[in-house]
Amino acid sequence: MSTQTRVRHFLADDDLTPAQQREVLELASELKQHPYSRKTYDGPQSVAVLFDKTSTRTRFSFDAGISQLGGHAIVVDSGKSQMGKGETFQDTGAVLSRFVSTIVWRTGSHQNLLDMAETATVPIVNALSDDLHPCQILADLQTCIEHLCPQEGVPGLKGLKAVYLGDGDNNMANSYMIGFATAGLDITIIAPKKFQPKQEFVDRAEKRASETGAIVSVTADISAVSDADVVITDTWVSMGMENDGIDRRTPFLPYQVNDEVMALAKKSAIFLHCLPAYRGSEVAASVIDGPQSVVFDEAENRLHAQKALLVWLMENQPR
C-alpha cells in the first residue's frame, strides 16, 4: 500500500491479510451466484485496464466483470500509449487517477506497479507481473473451495495439501506459496534445484504461514506429490522467456504432470493450470482433459474472484 497517497492497492498476494482474503473469496462465491447484484461502478465509472503483455483470460474476465459491476473498461495496450516512453509511471498514475476509479495493470517488472502506486489516488490491481500473479490465486482458491470443501467454505482450505510442479522460479510459483499460505493450505513447490523459488518469496510465504499454520516447502523430489489434494503446474516457458537461450524443456521433463504423477495424489485430488496449457509438455493430455481436471472452472472463476476483489477494494479504502 502506498503510504504517500493512503490508497489500498492489490499488488501482491500478501497485500491481503488472511481475514481480508476470506472476505474476498466469500464475496466471489456470492457474485458467482448473483452476477449482477453489485453495481460498484454505477454511474458509470471507468476502469483503466492496461496491458504490457498479451492476454486472453485476463482481458476478457476483467472487461466482462467491470461491465457486470456497472462500469466501463478502458482497455489500452502499451504499444498504443505513452506509458514507459519518457513519462514516468509515477506521472502516469497521478494522471490516470483523475480519469478513472481503478487501474488494472498487466505488466513486466513488478517495480512498475510500485512506482505507479507512489502517486495513484485510486486502487491499482496487479493483473500479472514478472514476480506475482495474485488475481489468479484468488480464482484458484475459489475453485479449491468449490471442489474440495464447498460446505466448510474458506476455513475448509486449512490443512489441505497443494503441490506445484515445474518451474519454481516464476510468478505463479511465488504467488502460490504466498497466496495459498495466506489461506492456510500447505503448499510444496517441486522443481529442479536450478529452477526453485528465490528466497525472498519463500520468506514471505513462510511469514504468512506462521500466521495461518500452513506449511511451505520446496523440494526437487517428485514423491512429495504423495497424498496431495491439489496438483498444479504451469507452462515451462513463461511470457518473455521464449528467446532467452535457456533450455527449459530438458530439466522439466521429469516434472510433467501425467497419470503416474496424479496416481501419487489422493484419488479425490483436483488438477489446476492457469492456462494456456501445452499438452505433452508440462501436462499430459490425459490429465488436463481427464476427470480430475477443473481448469475451465478455474478459468471461469477469474471473472468472479476479480469482481469480488474490485468490489472489496472500492468498499475498503482508508477514510
UniProtKB/Swiss-Prot annotation:
Q: Name one GO molecular function term.
A: amino acid binding
Primary localisation category: cytoplasm
Instruction: List the pathway annotation.
Output: Amino-acid biosynthesis; L-arginine biosynthesis; L-arginine from L-ornithine and carbamoyl phosphate: step 1/3
Coiled-coil residue windows: none
Pfam families cross-referenced by the UniProt entry: OTCace, OTCace_N
Q: What reaction gets catalysed by this protein?
A: carbamoyl phosphate + L-ornithine = L-citrulline + phosphate + H(+)
Q: Where in the cell?
A: Cytoplasm
Question: Could you tell me the EC number(s) of this protein?
Answer: 2.1.3.3
Q: Which UniProt keywords apply?
A: Amino-acid biosynthesis, Arginine biosynthesis, Cytoplasm, Transferase
Residues recorded as binding L-ornithine, renumbered to this chain, are: 171, 234, 238-239
Asked if Transferase is a keyword of the record, the answer is yes
For the ligand (carbamoyl phosphate), the binding residues are: 55-58, 82, 106, 133-136, 274-275, 302
Which function does this protein serve? Reversibly catalyzes the transfer of the carbamoyl group from carbamoyl phosphate (CP) to the N(epsilon) atom of ornithine (ORN) to produce L-citrulline.
- Family membership: Belongs to the aspartate/ornithine carbamoyltransferase superfamily. OTCase family.
Q: Which protein, by its recorded name, is this?
A: Ornithine carbamoyltransferase
The organism's taxonomy opens as: Bacteria, Bacillati, Actinomycetota, Actinomycetes, Mycobacteriales
User: What is the name of the gene encoding this protein?
Assistant: argF
